[in-house]
Swiss-Prot record:
Family: Belongs to the glutamate 5-kinase family.
Protein name: Glutamate 5-kinase
GO molecular function, one term: ATP binding
Species per Swiss-Prot/TrEMBL record: Wolinella succinogenes (strain ATCC 29543 / DSM 1740 / CCUG 13145 / JCM 31913 / LMG 7466 / NCTC 11488 / FDC 602W) (Vibrio succinogenes)
Recorded superkingdom: Bacteria
């Protein structure tokens, strides 16, 4: 039995000013397939702000408004997950975490104990950062970078075998594919340079706060602790499905400590 953390961001779960329900449904079916195979799954999700905006169109450029949208949107987001997962026979559970929860050994232990109970009963833990109070993320300073680094902490402290980050790109390219048509996906990465980890963070879209850099920082965090991360396209789950369900590496990038594959 594997324990897998899946992270999905706002760029995938929203389309314009609406929620992308077709993508959420595809994600939930994929999770159901993994669970049917016997895997334990923890989902780290963004998009509370995006969900809130569907109910109240506040100016997202103002931090208090983004916090308010997160407060409005989190229950809406969980309701969408509940409606989508129920026909698949999956019961979801919400957990809101922050950087502080991983700075405190006691709080980390409490969260871990909760996760263990949920997984032991077949429940799907759905984790988001507590955006209504996590001002740094909403202020685009990205404590966890649209939950990229949060998902790495979840994978590490909750003993996952691998973190799957579903993104709006096919993997980690050797150069910017928007500028260089000959850019190629790096299939396996064993090491990341300081230059790669310190580049400027750029948002994916109006709702997202992460970028490729926060994903690399998540990968670096896990590799240094002997754990793996797989970066794949979330618009089409074919590569993620092949890798995790069939053990076939088509596209996508596997980040793993040197020498492994």
């Amino acid at each position: 039995m594997r324990r897998i953390v899946i992270k999905v961001g706002s760029a995938l779960l929203s389309r314009g000013h609406e929620m992308a329900m077709d993508r959420m449904e595809s994600l939930c079916r994929f999770i159901a397939e993994l669970k049917q195979k016997g895997d334990e799954v923890i989902l780290v999700t963004s998009a509370a702000v995006a969900a809130g905006y569907t109910a109240l169109a506040l100016d997202k450029r103002q931090l208090p408004n983004r916090q308010a949208l997160a407060a409005i949107g989190q229950p809406l987001l969980m309701n969408l997950y509940h409606q989508t997962l129920a026909p698949l026979g999956i019961l979801p559970a919400q957990m809101l975490l922050s950087a502080y929860d991983f700075d405190s050994r006691k709080r980390t232990e409490n969260a871990r104990n909760t996760i263990e109970v949920l997984l032991s009963h077949g429940v799907l833990p759905i984790i988001n950062e507590n955006d209504a109070v996590a001002t740094k993320e909403l202020d685009m300073l990205a404590v966890f970078g649209d939950n990229d680094r949060l998902s790495a902490h979840v994978a590490h402290y909750f003993s996952a075998e691998i973190l799957l980050i579903l993104s709006d790109i096919d993997g980690y390219y050797d150069k910017n594919p928007c500028e260089f048509p000959d850019a190629k996906i790096r299939r396996v990465v064993n090491f990341l340079t300081p230059e790669e980890l310190e580049a400027e963070v750029s948002p994916n879209n109006a709702f997202a706060t992460g970028g490729i850099v926060t994903k690399l920082q998540a990968a670096d965090f896990l590799m240094k602790r002997g754990q793996k991360m797989f970066l794949a396209n979330g618009f089409n789950l074919g590569d993620a499905r092949s890798f995790l369900l069939e053990g076939i590496h088509c596209q996508g990038t596997l980040f793993v400590q040197g020498g492994e594959s």
